Amino acid sequence: YLYLYEDNHIVIGIISLVPGPDPDYQSIIWKNSGTSPLVLHRLCVDPHRQREGIGSRLMNFAETFGHEQGYTSLQLDTRISNHTAANLYEQLGYTKTGTITRNRGNFICYEKKL
């Protein structure tokens, strides 16, 4: 699923969601394991429009969408160096569940029960 956040017909944010589980997350012990997760793969906000709450609104949309579609949790990851995203996820009630390493670096995994 790919959803756009628009302002006056201009895209200023996107969110990409896919049904889980994600194969990259096999090493993670999820708190809601054995359930049906929705996985966030991308959250992007126009740099000129950051700090306006758009990321939070997109995340709230993802949580509502996931719950309405019958998913039991939302799982995601972010680069260890991406403190802005990590702070957002933690402020929204996401729990750190572990780390993974991919060819692009190290990532922190987060989860929230829906």
Q: How should these model regions be labeled?
A:
Residues M59, G66-D77:
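Conserved GNAT acetyl-CoA-binding A-motif
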Residues G34-P37, T72-A86, E90-L92, T99-L114:
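C-terminal "cap" of GNAT-fold acetyltransferases
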